[in-house]
């Protein structure tokens, strides 16, 4: 005992008992040449990193797979990988994530990806799902845009057995040009280019060669990258003779590649363990390395180049590195189509039945929504399945990644979903007359975002809200956040809303902030129904019990007063107990929302992935006819637009779902005025998902 006490005193005196954080980043090299460059990298970084900063070390392995295992096990910390290896690194049990991405092009126009597209001649009449029996042109065997992506996406349509893959592809197309394929074993793959020459000197090799195969060699479709046709045909009139095949089995002009591509091919990425604190150290080293040893910075050592060989540690063609947003995992980095293509080829497992008969997997928030979804699933005879998530953004993420298929969102979250590549499919409609006359408008008429106060508070108005207590439906939601905070931002010109209001409840805001002070839980300030003040009714209850102003939809007060809400907090409330704040500084009764509102907002809308949109629309059209025939029929049986608590899965005041015109974009649905409002507050956004989804667009 005496020895233990003495040892502790000695430790304390010497400071040895304090854990010293490990600031060493161990880079993994896969060859002798890479390791030699890594050692030079290490030595040069010593001269430019601060004395108390991170340090670089090198670990040599013999393969990317060994490096991935070493990083996962803590023996190494980082390595740069191409997309296929990023996929492997992200899988369990490796669980690595991208922390930085190489970019190409220039500092002014950094490119972290290119797009794989399918080009066809204008005037032909087939779609992506009708390629069987056509003649195909590929950049080369095993290449991303020309083979991995198109064959991966077509994999489940290939005839069985699908091994060897080349044989299945040869049977699927009536003839092909696949440079580098074996002309003896698979002669049909070389039918359009005898010998399947594997050299850039061959006429049909590579991107330009695959397009020439389409143009001059008898092909029906060419799998290339989005810039290829612009390089070969600089004149628009010439390009207009060609079209792109889209994932949703439509066609678009070749200059609309952003809306019609097979997959995004991401740049090489630096990967690391998820959440052990090394990401910041890795980025600090890379940031300093670029500044001192990037393109054209130093003759002594070049980060993106080496006399020892090609593409050591980083690609020689890289112009620099960008930090990847913290929310981005390997799936968001690679994109759903890329992940699907690789997974199909690696695992060789295809779902039973086609996408046209598959159930729709709905994403539910919280236990209450999941309970309603499960009831819907049982009633739907297998047409609906359920997936759960803790937040709306988590649900959007799951839909993007194919773990779920659809959900209904307010405009603010529909904007985020749109930025993540999802599309609007059907709109909630709150006007029974336009349900019975669906042609009256292309899109259902929107609702009003309003600011509600207590009539007893005579001093409050739109211009003196500073220091008041605010109640919001949730961060990034339309009526409760984007519209009022966008208007506020244009006035105060900063994003410190938690300093503008004295207290508030804004579910989804930073925890321990004053804008979570008024929230009641049980999951305090959570952006779901586990926060009692979440949503329209929750924000109104917050006003009744604690707040000075609530930002909600125009129907909220009407739905919760004059006996329409029998909950203890609402049963005695009267409409005249509340007023609306008008932007001109006046007030009006809650029934005069048409002339006293902050803005008109788009109705909530069902979103899905492009390739799933048609199926979602078909299933929902049948489901709404089965499970909603009006309030009077909504007794005893499952009802789509009725909830045990407020607004589960859909708004309870929904009268029908209106099908949107095919190809409607989120920008078209939300409208220019609303997009401008969201744009105003974009710089204040705390959405990590939005940051991740726009990374490859920046």
UniProtKB/Swiss-Prot annotation:
Q: Which organism is it from?
A: Rattus norvegicus (Rat)
Which residues participate in Fe(3+) 2 binding?
Answer: 410, 447, 536, 604
Residues that bind hydrogencarbonate 2: 473, 477, 479-480
Q: Which domain of life is it from?
A: Eukaryota
Q: Which residues carry this modification: Dimethylated arginine?
A: 42
The record's account of tissue expression is:
Expressed by the liver and secreted in plasma.
What is the name of the gene encoding this protein?
Tf
Q: Which GO terms describe its molecular function?
A: enzyme binding; ferric iron binding; ferrous iron binding; iron chaperone activity; transferrin receptor binding; transmembrane transporter binding
Q: What is the stated purpose of this protein?
A: Transferrins are iron binding transport proteins which can bind two Fe(3+) ions in association with the binding of an anion, usually bicarbonate. It is responsible for the transport of iron from sites of absorption and heme degradation to those of storage and utilization. Serum transferrin may also have a further role in stimulating cell proliferation.
> Which InterPro entries does this one have?
Serotransferrin_mammal (IPR030685), Transferrin (IPR016357), Transferrin-like_dom (IPR001156), Transferrin_Fe_BS (IPR018195)
| Residues the record lists as binding hydrogencarbonate 1 | 139, 143, 145-146
Name the UniProt record assigns to this protein: Serotransferrin
Its GO biological process annotations read: actin filament organization; acute-phase response; antibacterial humoral response; apoptotic process; cellular response to cAMP; cellular response to follicle-stimulating hormone stimulus; cellular response to iron ion; ERK1 and ERK2 cascade
